[in-house]
Amino acid sequence: MLISPFRAFALIALFSLCLSKAQAQLLPTPSAGEMAFAAGNLESAQKFYSAAVKAAPEALAPRLGLIRTLMRQDNWPEALAEAQAAALKFTTSADAHGLLSLALIRAGWSGEYIKEAAQSLALDTNNYWGLLATGRAAEWEGDYKAAHCCFWHASETHPEWPEGWGQLLVLEDDTLTLKEATQIAAIYLKLDPHGHPHKEIVENARDITENAAAYQAFFSGSKTFQRIHSPLAPGTESLQSSSTVVDFLGDFAIFPVTINGQPFRLLFDTGGGDDILLFWNSAKRLHLPSLAHTHIRGVGGSEKSDVLKAESMEIAGVPFRSIKIVTADSMLDKTDGILGGNILNDSVVTLDFEKRTALLTNGANAQAPDPLSGDKSITLPFHYYHGCLYIQVAVNGQALWALLDTGAFRSTLSLRLAREQLRGLPKEDIQTGTDTGKRGIGSSDNKMQYIVSRYESQIQLSQNPPVYIPIDTAGTSDLDRQISPSAQTDFEISLWMGMSSFTYARRITFDYPRHLLTFEYKEPDLAPAPGPAKK
């Protein structure tokens, strides 16, 4: 059963009363670790908790505090190790199993995270960490209503803790109204959370509270805060196809898009979520007032953005209305901005790299086109999560989740995975360094660690038939820090698949309604390959 935001405010008030001077004497004296954690001094908290665990190995509380602190530091490998040890030692602790499930999720949906979450709630149906883990698992599977219920229940159980409120703010939940989002943001900000992933959620919460009036006034016809665009002609009753010639800049597909009657060239970006992003010099052509401010994020961190509203948009003959536009100071040559793939989430999108065209198909019978004569194809399911696409692949035999990003050129391994893949190889063939300078969207982070090696790896798309794509490990980067720990995804992404991987196919199809990815290829182009090879 859902609780109302007004009841949530009552819970917060009740918690505040519990901390009144009259009752404070009845509460146990907080430990040094707890005080450091509450103050946001996570480094000190880790030291205090580690010392407490060493001094009292049979005590559960300092172990739980240490795991929470490591998670806030986004030191998930150590958090996972501590959580596994705690769940093994304290088998009847719902907290230990719940935190272990969350650590497994952060590690990339690895292991038995569902089993651990279920074990937590079997021991205590109201366990905070078990509810959060169950909600995260439901969200990953697209069951937003179940996730919503879990996060509300967790927030009701511990209104003084920020994780539940934060998850409600980043949840893609169509039942959350702007008014409710504003109220939750106020509760969340009052708790003043520190560490991971709260820095980004705090930015989001401030954007919501500061701009609520503007959003309410200009997008009042929308039921939800996030999704404010809707097609004029859904085309769900019959099959409708439209082909458009796209201008490929290198391997990037540039779609012709009309906004308020003005032509724009937008890069089709499956990693761009549900945004229409215009570079500011191009956005000026629309002569639209800035309605509000928000933060947008990319490999360069975050940057502040203006929010605009356009009345109409057309993509390959498909019209849309009530268009939310965000702006960026970034620039890409010969383009006006980015078309987030989630805008076309009712369509089947086929990119033909030989004909240099894109085919958009709508309707109940829409699907990938049949392979051309002599071609083969494989179809893989993808997870559709916060507007981005993820497929499970293997790199040199290691299973992992890969982000599909048509807005990126190179396919990139994370530093963590690259180090694992290159372990034991001659050191003279491997170099590390730090790159500085502007990269893509975002302006808050201009440093990226990298590894350069003389070895290649392969991405295994499928086992039957065996299909591989080569990847150059010189393209490794710090995905662990710059991509994975976002407030929305918050799980380990080991591989970033850019257009350099897609163009090994003749055609690729993104079937958004059915969550399917189809690679059409010629036999020699995607063939079995041996293990890591020296170049």
Where are these regions (language model features)?
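N-terminal secretory signal peptides that target proteins for export/translocation
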Residues: 1-5
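N-terminal leader/linker segments that initiate helical-solenoid repeat arrays
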Residues: 22-65, 72
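Bacterial N-terminal signal peptides
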Residues: 8-21
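Pepsin/retropepsin-fold aspartyl endopeptidases
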Residues: 43, 47, 51, 65, ...
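Alpha-helical structural motif
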Residues: 10, 29, 451-453
